[in-house]
């Protein structure tokens, strides 16, 4: 009679980071894909934020981001009396100029800011944000669609529009999803996560996103000096370009990084984990059936 073999594992981890800048958000590329670290929802003084666009660019570069989108509110302009700006593309133009000597890709976007339904949504890859200024909320979405923007539902669980933090899915939302007027959904916004929004993404095949929606200072909001990080969307694109990024977003090739956790669908989440962890060495401890395995972690995730 054969005796069962009991094999024990002793696992150690090494981290493949230099430690020169611990705040940089770092994840490996996947076979055939570039992993782009993106924050696609933020504000400056050109809507209701507290900083000039150059600060958003500087913060993004410090965090090692690949892509940001300027997404000022179309309808809500807190500082318009102090900073008049008839051109709603101005925030983007400034940010793009400030980023010209870096590798940061800046997208033109706007936040369509309406009552529920449909609520708030971001349209990115815009050609002209001014054309989204209209009384009819659906006309704003249709104009964004006309400009081939990628449109996603912002903070559907936001307490100001959903007091119980549920996702108030309306028939209008379903019609908009069916007509490609909503292509993605924030499952993470700022410091909040919605499991219901994630389920909605699964049910309606929406792209999942996580964003900072930052209005003030990134370092203060996410306690960067204490080891925190902003929420971001990891987008798996063929190359770092607007066209490739847009295609990847439309194909749902994303994972969210939030509070030191990875959230996503298995088709890209599992490859990301597999490419983050590598077996560095494996050997038996003398005179035992214990295998000492050393794994290398070349990502920010604390596996």
Where are these regions (language model features)?
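Sec-dependent N-terminal signal peptides
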Residues: 4-13
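Charged catalytic cores and adjacent phosphate/nucleic-acid-binding surfaces used
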Residues: 19-38, 54-57, 118-126, 164-303
